[in-house]
Amino acid sequence: MKIDRARAQKAFADYAAHYNAADAKVKLKIDHTYRVAALCARIAQSLALPPEDVDLAWLSGILHDVGRFEQLRRYNTFIDAQSVSHAAMSVAVLFDEGRIRDYLDDAGADALLRTAVEWHSAFRLPEALDDRTRLFCQILRDADKIDILRVNVETPMEEIYNVSTAALRRSPVTPAVLDAFYAHHCVLH
C-alpha cells in the first residue's frame, strides 16, 4: 500500500483548521501530532521496516489524536477521566464518520490503523493482537509517550491541565496514589 504523506498531512491540516490554532492547547496538539508522526517513522526506520511500513507508522502518528480537538472543544480538557476517551473519539471521527478516506483511499490498513489509534493511550494492549498489529501499536505508543514527556517538561501546567503549578503543589496526594507509588505499581484513575 502506498501512502501519500502530502495528502495525509493536508487532510490533517484541513481537519485541524476547524479549530482555533491561536489557542495554546490546540497549537500544542497540532505540533504534538507532527512530532509523534516523525517519531513513529524514526522508530520504524530503526527497526529496519520496509518503506511502506515506515509510512504506515508515520500515518498512525498523524491520526492518533484527531479526537483531542473535539474533546478540547467540547470539554476544554485533555483529561479523559473528566471528559471522554480521546482515543475512542479519534476512532469515531476517523472510522465511524469515514474521515479516514480523507487521508488514504486504500482500506487495506484500516483495521491495523483503527486498532493502533484505539489502543494508543490504554494502560495495556490486548493479548490477542497479531504480531504485526502489536508492533504498530507499540511504535505509536512509544512515540506518543516520548513526545508527551517532552511536552510535560517544556509546557506550563496551566496550558495543559487547567491547573496552576502552585495549586498542583498545594493539592494532597491520596493514600491510594501513595500506596501504588510505594508498591511500584501504575497509578490508574
Language-model segment annotations:
Residues 2-3, 25-30, 34, 38, ...:
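Divalent metal-dependent phosphate-bond-processing catalytic cores, especially two-metal-ion Mg2+/Mn2+ enzymes
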